[in-house]
Amino acid sequence: MKDGRNSFVATNSSRSTNKHFVLVHGGCLGAWCWYKLTPLLKSAGHRVTVLDLAGSGINSKQVNDLRSFSDYIHPFMEFMEYSVPGGISAKPEEKVILVGHSLGGLVISKAMETFPEKISVAVFVTALMPNITEEIDISDVVNEGSTGDSIYTYDEGVKDKPTTFICGPDYMSSTLYNLSPPEDIALAIMLMRPVRLYSMKDMLKEIAISKQKYGSVKRNFQCSIIEKDPTDEVKEITGSDHMVMISQPQQLFVCLQEIAEKA
């Protein structure tokens, strides 16, 4: 973010010192984007899981294989279902802290609705966060004309809406990584992969949220959304861009540590 501020969301539950963090990347990225934050969390005694969503990072799926949002988030949802304890036998300290960045906010929102009993805290890092009372609108996130040299494909014809998107180098340097080290920008340009642009109809169907489940996991978000949907805690990181885990990993770690201590 060019204004140098980033915000998160948090909820409360168990009170064990060492937590299990699950880090979920945004569109066009992969698990690799957490490489600075992961060792910081581990050095504090936390367990950390980083996942590649389908068609991202080193995941073998290709973007055109992912016909629905469920296909895209399948590796993460499978992990939440089978690798995170749940049910009446689960201990409070086994709950996870979810951290979603950018598009990853919608991914962890799906988990909050599906597995609320497995989550102690949900953290939205410059991320999309659904509002219980309003429809999701991501049209302004990847609108053509607002993303510079980014590339769109039209697999269903140029008269239809674009089907995939990948960040362009200039757009990344000027908007997403504008306060990040140049070597990290170079690395990201090499590792970017296209993300599928799902229709609003598909997104609304896939991320149907309720106050009883999704709403039971306390949350927070960026300034423009907080006004519409007041939430629980906001933390701001100065001197950061959209890629806060790259530009200000130490400050992000401190914020997450504070959240973990309250959880």
Q: Which role does the model predict for each range below?
A:
Residues 8, 19, 230-263:
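Catalytic active-site module of serine/aspartate enzymes centered on a nucleophile-bearing elbow/loop
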Residues 113-165, 200-203:
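Flexible "cap/lid" loop of the alpha/beta hydrolase fold
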Residues 203-205, 222-225:
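Short alpha-helix in the alpha/beta-hydrolase fold that links the catalytic acid
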Residues 47, 55-97, 110-118, 136-146:
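Active-site loop/oxyanion-hole signature of alpha/beta-hydrolase fold enzymes
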Residues 187-215:
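Active-site nucleophile elbow and catalytic-triad environment of alpha/beta-hydrolase enzymes
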Residues 13-60, 94, 114, 118:
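Conserved HGGG/HGGXW glycine-rich cap/lid loop of the alpha/beta-hydrolase fold
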Residues 99-104, 108:
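Gly/Ala-rich beta-loop-alpha elbow adjacent to hydrolase catalytic centers
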